[in-house]
């Protein structure tokens, strides 16, 4: 692979928006390694509007982004590094609606809002799940963009009547940065409206949806043009340059679904599975083509698009959300922060494998009293077991982590069988790669070595796509992953020896 001239480094800014926080990271790339510097972090989370609906305060996110970009510019100047690109990634499915003047109609709904309850079943009565899957390849999730649109888009809806364009969250931010409206394909593949084979909007699904739901007849015209990762979106608007102190920096499309960026930076071998571990765990394989069989649909696997024409064949399983919500509830009850390292150490000392709950149950999706929900789920398995395992917080944490590891192991085993791939290792990237107990339990549950890291996989993937787009690095995915191996600390967990 080619590299930058000796001693010369370039800067790339990754705007990484998650469901609980957003960050602005400066990636300093010399062609062989990437150094990441956090330049801004700000909270995120759904807020209830006057009707009790959950929405994202994207204007607060925008203020955090501008502050982070200003800080990134300061850091780059201190280091003598030129910022050559900016890329945006975020969580999937949620979107903003723009009116004819390009203004946001309302704050975007959160995928956890209850407005989609029951909507998928209504849609499937008109366009079956099997017909959906044959085109979009997506597992059943009740909150995809399609189902949100059915819940909120109709001719009688005042907001929808004003809509000229729909932009997914990272594309909305890119629009505010540049003034150009596009849809990056990896995130667009989570909408339910894309053809997994052609990587284009599905005329078939859109026509059938319009026929079934006349209020959505104009949806196709509201969807922007699709672009692949690495495409130039545009340069910073003058107002953004003034607000941040940055120059005429190019904004580049990256793998804007955060999981797509994370998988791009997972140093995978040809037969490795991955777990992108955060609020959700995205568990699966990287494939050259989608798997659209009936068996795959029945197993509820999804085909989301990845970098360089790849497919992320995966299942969304519950991630650290359940544990995080328990910790939040305990901190609120105690009036003090929870000692999470101490809690995890105590959980490791608990007997394992006594109880596995279905962490993918709908009862765990919404915020709320998560300790009680987990306790109730255990109770449904038997009162004696309930009293034995949930009497202490460490025991409850052990139940959660055992259950998460088991869910990931099941997903890997099923993906392997459905795709015809013999998996020889598991790569865990993202925040969950720092949870040593969960990594060890995953190695035991899968019977495979687990390689943990990088923690900052999403930001690394974001930066590397930008760096390749402008020629600072070159090569295919293997070459990009060589840069990751040189840049990140990886840790290996071996499965327990079999007796």
Role assignments for model-derived ranges:
Residues 1-106, 241-252, 446-448, 477:
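N-terminal glycine/serine-rich phosphate-binding loop of ATP-dependent small-molecule kinases
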Residues 2-5, 13-14, 124-136, 147-168, ...:
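Active-site core segments that coordinate phosphate-bearing ligands/cofactors
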Residues 74-111, 136-143, 174-195, 227-228:
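Short beta-strand-loop/turn "lid" adjacent to the catalytic site in phosphate-handling enzymes
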Residues 80-90, 165, 418-430:
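Short glycine-rich phosphate-binding loop at a beta-alpha junction
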Residues 89-92, 229-230, 277-280, 425-433:
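Glycine-rich beta-strand-to-loop/alpha-helix junction loops that act as flexible
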Residues 109-128:
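Short alpha-helix plus adjacent loop in nuclease-associated cores
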